[in-house]
UniProtKB/Swiss-Prot annotation:
Originating organism: Geobacillus kaustophilus (strain HTA426)
Name of the protein: Holliday junction resolvase RecU
Free-text cofactor note: Binds 1 Mg(2+) ion per subunit.
GO MF annotations, alphabetized: endonuclease activity; magnesium ion binding; nucleic acid binding
Cofactor needs: Mg(2+)
Keyword Iron: no
Listed GO biological process terms: chromosome segregation; DNA recombination; DNA repair
Subcellular location: Cytoplasm
Lineage, top ranks: Bacteria, Bacillati, Bacillota, Bacilli, Bacillales
Chain residues that bind Mg(2+): T84, D86, E99, Q118
Gene designation per UniProt: recU
Length: 200
């Protein structure tokens, strides 16, 4: 039975448009985790718990268009040097350095999310007695882990020798430490750092 408006025009109903899939945007892959960590670090700083900051990425600006002073647009820039890890700072008198990554994979963490220079930097931090780790999030499972750099480095070296290109989730569960999500702070990784690095 066809439905009609009082004017006699036929009612066609609301046909939903085909769901358009947004183009893949890899620039903000870790943005949710990054936002959570930035809020957590601000919480730690405000309460005098720890001083941890996100490292800025060193960029060399080459060309800027000035159509008008208030609308300057950077048209060409490049990274000055390879960035190391995402975050560093100090907690309880110890240097802390870590990388934060997330994946939509449910069964393993792809090592392609890391770069060789980041792994070498982690090796140097560990060699000098710093606390170094990765915070890994399985975004579809809403699970976040702290994995000590030694385990990440070992898996990286296996990959370099022709081994597996990802860390199985079971290995992260076995050697990593679950970080519960909360409200204040959002990702209380410092409580995990206390348990892993300060209760030996």
């Amino acid at each position: 039975m066809a439905l009609k408006y009082p004017s006699g025009k036929e009612y066609r109903g609301n046909k939903p448009n085909a769901a358009r899939r947004p183009a893949a945007d890899y620039a903000n892959r870790g943005m949710t985790l990054e936002d959570d960590l930035n809020a957590t670090n601000e919480y730690y700083r405000e309460r005098g718990i720890a001083v941890i900051h996100k490292k800025p990425t060193p960029v060399q600006i080459v060309r800027v268009d000035y159509p008008k002073r208030s609308a300057a647009v950077i048209t060409e820039a490049y990274f000055r040097q390879a960035s190391t890890t995402d975050y560093n700072g100090v907690y309880r008198g110890k240097y802390i350095d870590f990388e934060a990554k997330e994946t939509k994979n449910k069964t393993a963490f792809p090592l392609k999310n890391f770069h060789a220079h980041q792994i070498r930097h982690m090796e140097q931090v560990v060699a000098h007695g710093g606390i170094c780790f990765a915070i890994l999030r399985f975004s579809l499972l809403n699970e976040t882990y702290l994995l000590d750099a030694s385990h990440l480095i070992a898996w990286w070296n296996k990959q370099e020798a022709g081994g597996r290109k990802s860390i199985p989730k079971q290995e992260i569960e076995r050697h990593g430490h679950s970080i519960p999500l909360g409200y204040q702070p959002r990702i209380d990784y410092i409580s995990v750092v206390d348990n892993v690095y300060f209760t030996r």
